[in-house]
Amino acid sequence: MPLHKYPPALWDVLKLKDGIYARLPEHYRRSLLEKHKPYPVHWKPHGLKYRLNPKSGQRERVQDVPILPYFPPQANKGLWGGEGWVTGYHYANNDKLSARVKKVWKPQLFKRELYSEILDKKFSITVTMRTLDLIDAAYGFDFYILKTPKEDLNSKVGMDFKRAMLMRLASKDSNLYPNDPSKRDQIYNKYKEFVIPMEEAEWVGLSLEEAVEKQRLLEKKDPTPLFKVYVEELVKQIETQTLAEPAIIGKKP
């Protein structure tokens, strides 16, 4: 007899079909269901299912076992480029005859100022050397944020940057360099491949809790004061009574 009515792997999918979750925008619910494997940072996949054993010459199966890093809460406040804490073991005093002790390898963090052309502002962000290399490879901070999928960014502040950039591009006429039309057109043409409608841009990067709260605020209606309700009812009653009464026409002398 199964322990659950539905397998746990389907819980996240079924949750989006009920209650306020079902009323979330379709594009946002679709983004939650789209899962992509992050780029391997701390390990190198073989890329093969089978290989020849160099000693026996027999074909043997190759198994890729990924190294899953731990991302502490402070990783959401910076751009670590997919790096995280890796837990393992090493020999004490670098001696194989010594005891094996636990060790945590952590990435080296730096504080750097990064400039965004779309937002026209500098930001002081905690980064790693790999992040800086990825920014250089993408030809700029904006391209790195817009091109990198959420699984590789793996940062709340990174997704906040992406949402702010997409919203700025979507509202080109009002917020994108309002005092410099030539600069506005130049920046817009440079990043126009990433332009999406404002209705989608404002939902990018929101967590499920934030999206639910946003949907509640959109559906929220302030209660109408009772005195307004009673005044409207009184006006309708007077209008109905006036129309029902016969008109009195006075006789001419």
UniProtKB/Swiss-Prot annotation:
Residues 1-55 form a transit peptide. Keywords: Mitochondrion, Ribonucleoprotein, Ribosomal protein, Transit peptide. Signal peptide: none annotated. It comes from the Eukaryota. InterPro entries: Ribosomal_bL28, Ribosomal_bL28/bL31-like_sf. It is found in: Mitochondrion. The keyword Ribosomal protein applies. One of its GO terms (molecular function) is structural constituent of ribosome. One of its GO terms (cellular component) is mitochondrial large ribosomal subunit. The keyword Mitochondrion applies. Its main location: mitochondrion. It holds the Pfam family Ribosomal_L28. Belongs to the bacterial ribosomal protein bL28 family. Component of the mitochondrial ribosome large subunit (39S) which comprises a 16S rRNA and about 50 distinct proteins. PANTHER family: 39S RIBOSOMAL PROTEIN L28, MITOCHONDRIAL, LARGE RIBOSOMAL SUBUNIT PROTEIN BL28M. This is Large ribosomal subunit protein bL28m. The gene is mrpl28.
